[in-house]
Each structure stands twice: as C-alpha cells, then as structure tokens.
C-alpha cells in the first residue's frame, strides 16, 4: 500500500477500480473481503478475516505472548497458523478463567477502554462464608487505599455452606489486581479467583486450557457493546445496596 497522498492521486487519476468500475472519490468505502479492488492492472490481495476466540486460561499461565523467564504463556495454547492473535486485557497468573483472544486490534482496544465499561464477572471461592455486612460493602464499593475506591458492583451468592462460599462479583472497571485488593480490604479469605464472563461472552463449560471460536452472534454482541460511548455499565446500572445482595438459584453461569 502507498502513502495516503499517493493513494488519493491514484484514485483521482482513475487507476483504482472496484469490481471493474473506476472509483474517483477517495472516501469511497469498500469491503476487500467481498469486492475485487485493482490498481492499474494489479489486483489487491484479499485481507485475512479476523479471528475471535474464548480461552479458558489455567492458573499459572501468563497473559503474554513471551516470557523471558520461560514461564508458560497463552501463546502456547494458540493456533500456530492464521492471523496474529493477542489477548484482550490481562488475567493475573494466579487467576483462571475467560480470556478473549483476537486479531482485531480495534475491537480489542475498545473492549479494554474504560469509556465503554464492559462488565466482567468473577467467581470468588472463599474458605469461610462471608457476613452480610461484608457482601454489602463489596457491592457498595471498597476503599483499598487512601483515596482509591472501587465503584458499586453487583454481588450474588452462587453457593454457600459451613466451610465456605462462592460469590459472583460483576465490575465494570479493571484496575490492577482489583478483585484481590477488594477482598484483602474486607478480610475475605479468598481461595481461588476465576473470571466467568466478559460482556456478553460466558466461560460456560469450556475446559481449562481449551480454546473455542466465538460465534458470529457473540462477535456481534461484543461489537454492539462498544458502539458509541456508554453512559454506564451493567455494574453501575445495578448497584447493590446493603439489603440488595442477591442469591443465585442455580450454579455457575452456563454458556447459552
């Protein structure tokens, strides 16, 4: 591809054709995956379609494509051929669960941008059942450093017993080790942390270390989630009040 000004000149000189027809407007939109574009007598190669995957990151795997120390990374779980893939956002090494992987840089950037407030749901496995007060504080926002607090979140009890509990926490922000810092601030005995949902995409029964392609409907759902500036995310729209901690009737979310 040439520089912008040279491309504009080629268009104005009638050198560019789309499906055999001369194009003279520089702003003309084309779909290179469907339409045939030629410059002079040379046809432009079709662009490789983007790929979108859901990956169940195991504990101990780093969310990076290379580690100088030789520790396991997500790269070893990705296809060796096809478009260049990269993870969307990060999960700590000691956190498991859903990680989106794609070759679509623009969509990935939007999904990570705080402007769009994409909700993410985590399952917190606790070694002791939490008090109602602790759950209420978790939902209202937690101060984990002077002047630094989490925003209101959605809290649900997935399972609860004498020896522990599983709590579903949905947040629409992504500060460094935020969920773990929230638990530490409330003295919640966190045994394990797993992300089970990102926006409309659910982890479901995807096995640890497994990778599955997203459906067209799921990709559309992600694009819809980042179309235009969102005034608020799911977690902010449904803040939990002291009496508003919800109990889930079923088990972990299932992929639909």
Feature names for model-found ranges:
Residues 1-256:
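Basic, flexible Lys/Arg- and Gly-enriched helix-loop patches that mediate nucleic-acid binding at interfaces
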